[in-house]
Design a protein with these regions (language model features):
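Mature-region segments of soluble proteins
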Residues: 6-18, 22-26, 30-138
Length: 138
């Protein structure tokens, strides 16, 4: 990879699962590291697609706000992501599919076995443990 995906993956992780008063965001939980490790393995096609997605989002952010995606702040990042997912950005099929894949991998990283780089200190599991579940039917 010519440029590091780390800041981009960290931005995406915190957009998928933002930090709030209940706990850490996706980046602090390790979701970005999980995705980085997955892309470093035998998934070179996915790594190239994610780099192309980063280029697309950087270009869009520069066009609208004069800075790359990682530097425009959460509200603008969310706006760009939502535009792609809603097809408002007129993105090609591969861009949409890559963003969806990246979101899926990020969610995996929130709850994966910590040995794979995500779910740091089992924070994702602890968040799930605090959730209320509906009663089971008998």
């Amino acid at each position: 990879m010519e440029k590091s995906l780390r800041p981009f993956l960290e931005s995406i992780a915190d957009r998928v699962f933002p930090p709030d008063e209940l706990g850490p965001g996706g980046c602090d939980i390790g979701a970005a590291e999980y995705v980085r490790r997955r892309l470093a393995g035998p998934r070179s096609a996915d790594r190239l697609a994610v780099a192309a997605l980063q280029d697309h989002l950087d270009a869009s952010a520069r066009e609208h706000w004069g800075a790359p995606f990682c530097d425009v702040g959460a509200p603008h990042q969310e706006r760009l992501i939502e535009a792609i997912l809603a097809d408002d950005a007129q993105a090609d099929v591969e861009t949409v599919a890559t963003l969806r894949l990246l979101i899926d991998m990020t969610v995996e990283g929130l709850f994966a076995d910590p040995g794979h780089g995500g779910n740091r200190n089992e924070a994702g599991w602890r968040l799930l443990a605090g959730m209320a579940y509906p009663p089971r039917a008998r």
